[in-house]
Structure formats: C-alpha cells, structure tokens
C-alpha cells in the first residue's frame, strides 16, 4: 500500500483512500492534495514519486506544471490592476497596447481577453512552441492578425495565448513581465509557492509529468480552418514539453 504523508481530516478519509488507490494502481505516479474548508486547511497530503523513472519521493515542497490553472493566477494579476484603477476591462485593448488595433481588432476589449471571446484564440501564422517562448515576436504576431470571429460574439478557448494577450497588457501598464508582476505583487507578499517562470534554482524539486493517453475525441470533421483546430494545433503542445528548461523558465 502506498505511503501517504501529511494530514487528512477524518471527514476526508475517502479522499485519502482514492489517493492511495491511484498510487497503488499506477494511475498516478505521485501527487499532492490540499483542501481548504471554511478557511481551514483540512487536507494536506502527498505520496508517490516525482517521476515514473525516478524513485525519489514526492515531498511536501514538490511542485509540478499545472497547465491552465496558471490562467487563474494570470487573471488575478489583471484584476489586481483593476482594483488599483490601472486597468479597465471595458476599455479597448489598444488603450494599453496600441499595436493591437489592426485587422478588425480595434474594438476588442480587455474583458474579451479574460473571457475567451476576443476572436484571437491562437496564432494565425504557423508557430512552434519555440516561437511562443519568444515574447516579443509572438505578441507581435498576435497584434497583426485578424480575429477568427467577431470579437465578443462567441467564446473560444484561448488555450496557449491568453497569457500572451493579458500578459502583454500587464507589461504595457507596469513595465513588468506577467511572471515578474505576479511574483512581486502576489506570490511573495502572500508566501505562495506558485511560479510563472520558474527560477533554475527551483528545477530540482519539479515532478515530471507522465504523458496521458491520446484523446478519444476526433475533431478532424471540423476542418482545418475551424478556430478550435487552429487553436489547438498552433502550436501543438505535448505533455513532455513541460520538462524542457525553456518551458519552465517561460
């Protein structure tokens, strides 16, 4: 039976049993679980190893790539600027990022970025993950392209570029990269061990992701020009990319 460390309120024993079962079956290599209830930390437990091919144990301070959970921290950063009166979500994006007002995007508002309705849910021009690491180039491409639908009229998940869109607005207002602003104004003041751009000094405590099985849904019937296809293929992101140093620094 898998060894579970930490604490678990008896009311959440079923959750502990699920974690044990997942580790025993191999459904999870390693994991941590925390639950807050009424402002109280009632579950804080972890177990397993940091990688399928590494027997090092998952520790209390092990961290892991959390994919789009980062969008929550990005939104929190933007809303902090709203709270300070520095950002108006109803203002055109061009108020803060003038170059964005091209090719029919003049009326795109900041709230369209935050709500996945801007019509710019991905890169129009072919891009690779390496291209996305180049902030100046990748945001410039977003500024020049036309929206894929009328901004504000529909929703389409901004899978890989929402951080670039909102992050560039944050940068134009503060002069700081999104990760720098988040660290200085949110993470460090509140003692939060969450990173947008991980320092190399922290690489040693990062767990390695195990790629999931291929998706069962087939989206080819939508056609190559469908916004969803263009979004998720430009660029195509694989789980193993999260183990790259460039990804961790981004």
Where would I find each of the regions flagged by the language model?
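Short alpha-helical patches at coil-to-helix transitions and adjacent helical residues
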Residues: 12, 63, 69-75, 107, ...
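Terminal-appendage/accessory-domain detector
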Residues: 1-3, 40-42, 242-250
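Short, surface-exposed loop or secondary-structure junction motifs
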Residues: 103-250
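Short, well-structured active-site flanking segments
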Residues: 42, 73, 79-98, 173-199
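Generic short alpha-helical segment signal, independent of protein family or function
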Residues: 20, 24, 47, 79-87, ...
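Residue-level preference for non-acidic, small/hydrophobic
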Residues: 19, 33, 39, 71-74, ...
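Short, conserved catalytic-motif segment at the N-terminal edge
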Residues: 3-67, 88, 144
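Short secondary-structure junction motifs
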Residues: 28-30, 84, 88-90, 105, ...
């Amino acid at each position: 039976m898998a060894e579970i460390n930490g604490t678990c309120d008896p009311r959440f024993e079923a959750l502990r049993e699920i974690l044990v079962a997942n580790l025993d079956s191999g459904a999870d290599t390693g994991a941590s679980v925390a639950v807050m209830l009424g402002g109280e930390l009632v579950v804080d437990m972890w177990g397993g190893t940091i990688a399928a091919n590494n027997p090092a144990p998952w520790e209390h301070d092990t961290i892991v790539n959390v994919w789009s959970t980062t969008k929550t921290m990005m939104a929190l950063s933007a809303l902090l600027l709203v709270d300070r009166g520095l950002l108006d979500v109803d203002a055109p994006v061009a108020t803060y990022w003038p170059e964005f007002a091209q090719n029919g995007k003049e009326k795109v508002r900041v709230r369209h970025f935050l709500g996945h309705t801007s019509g710019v849910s991905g890169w129009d021009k072919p891009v690779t993950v390496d291209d996305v690491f180049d902030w100046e180039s990748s945001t410039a491409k977003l500024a020049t392209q036309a929206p894929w639908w009328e901004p504000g009229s529909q929703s389409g998940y901004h899978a890989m570029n929402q951080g670039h869109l909102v992050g560039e607005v944050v940068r134009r207002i503060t002069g700081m990269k999104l990760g720098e602003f988040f660290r200085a104004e949110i993470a460090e003041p509140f003692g939060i061990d969450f990173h947008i751009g991980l320092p190399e000094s922290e690489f040693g405590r990062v767990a390695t992701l195990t790629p999931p099985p291929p998706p069962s849904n087939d989206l080819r019937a939508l056609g190559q020009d469908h916004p969803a296809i263009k979004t998720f293929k430009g660029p195509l992101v694989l789980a193993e990319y999260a183990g790259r140093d460039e990804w961790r620094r981004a």
